[in-house]
């Protein structure tokens, strides 16, 4: 008998839980009265690129919960946007090319009763992706090619880069996500042989532009062999901080997350803009370089804000730490300027976006016309906080070594 009672109780509990899982989780309707409709104002429709905003007058309903807008996109999919009872407008997005669409505005009360719909006609403008696509500028470059585009409305977009494979099918090789107003984006790691490429832009609503098709031949480049680098002694103008190391080779040890005194090259400069020099071990036409600052002080303290790089093939100049800049060749007539993605003040620690950007290394390209050189002088013109010291974590150079 005890066993029978236990089984009965267990069945009751299981049945009870099963029943609870199917119950409505929320407020049951307290009435079935149909709420009143919204009143769309005479100038209540504001059309914009990719959508529209509808402004209306709310009904006098004490239990109004929200207003929903139901509409169909050109691809046939249905969308629904909701605006709270404290708002008198609803914004609709997701349209591609300019179109006429009809929107149903429906009020919903706390009992989930719905009003009769009010139909509103909107005339959307082209999505921003088409203007972005028209602004797209593509040029052959080192190790691939470069993309530039303008996005004045800061639309969240995706730029996809494809290459025609041996089966005559375009396959994706790069995908870039951005909402920045102006973008310069290299595509790297490609062989220096002619190939067919395709580029298109889409938004987060799956609207696509046409595909720009180009045949391009990337310029050859390779990362210079760091094992060949030879450090040049530091100028007597400067001293090494006790918080850093005098071993210049830490700048090409392959570790980009150094913080301690044994991993950071740290110069106290005084009245002069700090610099150091390297013998690359090979004469090379440089294409670009990448710079990493001290990890725990990204975009702060002694992190470089402005950089200039000089080169020479004269060993008497290159090996002399006291040689004047006038004896060297300036390789970047336009100063390399560090850019902080967040745009925040240096007094504010790096955001997640800042950190990820800096951890990947900040990169600059050399002009095409720079001569091939063997010695480099790296000079910091300013820091993010205006200090006269330099902290550097890692540097890497790419280019084309010259045969003797």
Region roles according to the model:
Residues 80-86, 172-180, 355-357:
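Short beta-strand segments within Ig-like beta-sandwich modules, predominantly Fibronectin type-III
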Residues 215-283, 294-295, 299, 345-347, ...:
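Disordered, acidic Ser/Thr/Pro-rich linker "stalks" and the adjacent N-terminal cap
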Residues 16-19:
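C-terminal motif of bacterial Sec signal peptides marking the signal peptidase cleavage site
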Residues 258-325, 360-404:
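Aromatic, loop-rich ligand-recognition surfaces of beta-strand-rich domains
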Residues 51-53, 58-78, 150-173, 300-305:
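Solvent-exposed loop/turn segments flanking beta-strands in beta-repeat/beta-sandwich domains
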Residues 65, 90-118, 182-219:
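Beta-strand-rich modules
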């Amino acid at each position: 008998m005890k066993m029978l009672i236990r089984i009965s109780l267990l069945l009751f509990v299981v049945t009870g839980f099963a029943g609870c899982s199917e119950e409505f989780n929320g407020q049951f309707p307290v009435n079935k009265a149909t709420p009143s409709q919204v009143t769309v104002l005479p100038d209540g429709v504001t059309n914009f690129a990719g959508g529209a905003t509808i402004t209306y007058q709310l009904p006098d309903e004490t239990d109004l919960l929200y207003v929903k807008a139901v509409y169909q996109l050109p691809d046939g999919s249905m969308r629904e946007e909701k605006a709270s009872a404290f708002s008198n407008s609803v914004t609709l997005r997701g349209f591609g090319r300019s179109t006429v669409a009809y929107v149903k505005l429906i009020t919903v009360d706390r009992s989930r009763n719905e009003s009769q719909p009010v139909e509103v006609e909107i005339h959307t403008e082209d999505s921003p992706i088409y203007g972005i696509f028209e602004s797209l500028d593509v040029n052959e470059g080192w190790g691939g090619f470069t993309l530039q585009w303008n996005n004045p409305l800061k639309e969240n977009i995706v730029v996809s880069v494809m290459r025609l494979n041996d089966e005559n099918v375009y396959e994706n090789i790069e995908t870039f996500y951005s909402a920045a107003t102006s973008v310069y984006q290299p595509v790297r790691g490609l062989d220096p042989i002619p190939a067919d490429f395709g580029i298109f832009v889409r938004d987060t609503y799956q609207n696509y532009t046409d595909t720009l098709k180009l045949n391009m031949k990337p310029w050859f480049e390779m990362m210079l062999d760091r094992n060949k680098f030879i450090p040049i002694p530091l100028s007597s103008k400067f001293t090494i901080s006790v918080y850093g190391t005098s071993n210049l080779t830490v700048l090409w040890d392959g570790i980009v997350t150094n913080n301690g005194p044994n991993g950071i090259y740290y110069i106290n400069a005084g009245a002069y803009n700090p610099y150091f020099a390297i013998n690359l071990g090979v004469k090379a036409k440089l294409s670009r370089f990448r710079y990493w600052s001290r990890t725990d002080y990204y975009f702060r303290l002694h992190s470089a804000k402005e950089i200039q790089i000089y080169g020479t093939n004269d060993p008497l100049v290159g090996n002399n730490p006291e040689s004047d800049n006038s004896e060297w060749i300036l390789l970047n007539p336009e100063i390399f300027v560090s850019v902080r993605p967040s745009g925040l003040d240096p007094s504010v620690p790096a955001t997640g976006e800042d950190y990820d950007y800096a951890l990947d290394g900040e990169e600059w390209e050399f002009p095409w016309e720079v001569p091939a050189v063997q010695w480099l002088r790296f000079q910091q013109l300013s820091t993010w906080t205006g200090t006269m010291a330099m902290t550097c974590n890692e540097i890497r150079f790419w280019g084309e070594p010259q045969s003797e």
